[in-house]
Amino acid sequence: MLAVLTGDSIRDEVGPLPCIDLYPDSKPALHSVLALDKVRYVGEPLAVVVAEDPYLAEDAGELVDVTLDPLPPVLDLQDAVAEDAPLLYEEYGTNIANTITHDVGDVDAAFADADHVYRETFDIHRYGPVPMECRGALAQVEPGTGRITLYSSTQFPHLARQFLGGVLNVPESHIRVIAPDVGGGFGAKCEFYSEEVLVPLLARRLGRPVKWVEDRREHLISTTQAREQRHQVAAAVSADGTIQAISVESSTNNGAAMFTLATTPASIFSGMLRGPYRIPNYRARSHSVLTNKTPLAVYRGAGHPQAAFCMERMVDIIATNLGMDRAELRRRNMITSEELPSDRGTDIVLAGNVVYDTGDYPRCLDMALELLDYASFADEQRAERERGRYVGFGICSYVEETSTGPYESATVRVDSTGKVTVLSGSVPQGQGHVTTFAQLVADELEVDLEDVTVLQGDTDVIPDGVGTFASRSAAIGGAAARKGAEEVKRKAMIVASHALEVEIDDLEWEAGGAQVTGSPATRLELGELAQAATAWNALPEGLDGFNLDSTYRHQAAGIAFANATHVAKVEVDPETGRVTVLRYGVVHDCGTVINPLLVDGQVHGGVAQGIGGTLFEEFVYDEDGQPLSTTLLDYLLPLAEDMPHIDTGHLESPTYLNPYGMKGAGEGGAVGAPGALVNAIADALAPFGVQLTSDGPYSPGRIHELLRSAAPTAS
């Protein structure tokens, strides 16, 4: 054994882990690198041991003697806010870390004047990203200078560098962070963890490289979890189905500490609950609550899946009570394209004010309904019920905040052979950034895609950047790369003008080179232009060292809002309790589509995760706070055989917030799936009088439980 550290041994050497999305009046409840004085959840790091190989380290870890005095756990949201609830942080006097408020219009008057008022409580269960690759970190320290190099499976190496510098009190210039190829992130790696501090700290102490790789059990108990919320929703509705007001009291189970992006799910939920609907009056009170569970943070879509689920279940409940067609009720309340842009009167932490930019929500709905032939489904459903089969159709329409700032950087550089290198601050985990960014630059410079190399994920190579999260990479990072390419072309035309001794207005750009208009044989290729730009004394005064490169930082001008409608057709077998997804359809609007195949892949992957959360996945705890979902035998994931065919359509409503009209597409598939699937299950089980107010998981056992407790209806 080479080293042992505890919280006490590093108390004066490291600070707590940061949370960057706290509101000003929040109780910070920051996570210690190693537990200090109190352990607040199973899975919290207590000590670290270092050995020559992982087997010796595992054995040494068994020798660590921990003495704990048991404290009463608090796990449930309602229990956590009770007057006599045990406090996770006594100094705060409460388990509520913060409360987000929104007040739009006159909610009280709308409810007083409403023809109908509907109230429902919706529960969102706890599940998480569970990427194929768990987390890992490797650090080494440069002898003499003490400069740290950290390899980490992170979604934001530049922010990780900033956070590590703050926690260790080391200048950022003394830190290099490299994010190698990462096997999935989905938000779990968009957080900053204890191991990302401990590994470089130990490397510095030992003077040798130190590596840590998380196993699956560690991942399932220690890596941030997601989704768990409870929402008390009330809707004020006119007799014709117009939703006049929504009021919501919301709580998010944030677990035992406020992690890097802990407030974001609650903020997005409360800022976006009304989705694509007008609903002129709105009140939200959204609480972040501390409990003795693993900390909660962002997961693909953050608070959007919860918001879409609650709103779309509420719309179906209203339609059923009014005897209206579900699609027609949606159309009646949807914002039209002529009403955009639309200031919603809310805001989202780290993003800004919610002002819907572009879209055609009713058309998106109609296109999705056509994909699965909604018009004929009622007849199909009656015929199937006569045969003893229970099928249902579900709809979920939503609007999604994408392209979150503050900025992203890109450098575009041409070498003497005409090959192009793009350095981007965005970092991929399988989204296809390399293809997308190369395509944007190649299209602008009119060169072959194979001639463009994209480099990402190294803070020494790319000194400035933000990272990959919040469906921002194409719209922010891609825009930076495209603008960089535009500047390279502008410079190339200046060089060509001098070298060919013509005015710039007499030149045109064609097929990766500058040529004289009307005389295509008089031209310079991109590589020749790069050589001319760097040749000593070859350019007039003021243009010396005029390299054919450009670094561009694209600032987000606002939030670009994507939207979609998901539709699902399911069958529920009352005898076995099995839910089968028969067909699935998505019409997605992410503005200008750069690569349809990649967008489809993102949508399909998100739908798969939505199916997983709705039918299979759940983090379960016992009454003492012990996690019970600690292997993939207990935490179930969807298999290929569980996936339906997914019909995908695209609607393009370019945003005016960047020059190319792009919006984000990375998270949308996961946003609409829970709402569409649960609405479909509820539709299938309507003859049994089943009421669904949770997003899942709808396992066979859960379906049987619901059927036993339900009262059959006359339908």
Task: Kindly give the residue locations of the regions a language model identified.
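Short glycine-rich loop/turn motifs
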Residues: 36, 133-138, 230, 392, ...
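Short acidic, glycine/serine/threonine-rich loops at helix termini
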Residues: 14-19, 60-63, 130, 152, ...
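Glycine-rich loop/linker segments at domain edges
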Residues: 20-29, 94-137, 228-313, 399-407, ...
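C-terminal catalytic domains of large/alpha subunits in multi-subunit enzymes
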Residues: 8, 169-174, 204-210, 239, ...
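Conserved beta-alpha junction segments in alpha/beta enzyme cores
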Residues: 107-168, 393-425, 431
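Thiamine diphosphate
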Residues: 185-207, 211-213, 433-441
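Flexible, low-hydrophobicity surface segments
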Residues: 1-95, 117, 272
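Conserved catalytic cysteine-centered active-site region
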Residues: 37-38, 171-179, 202-215, 219
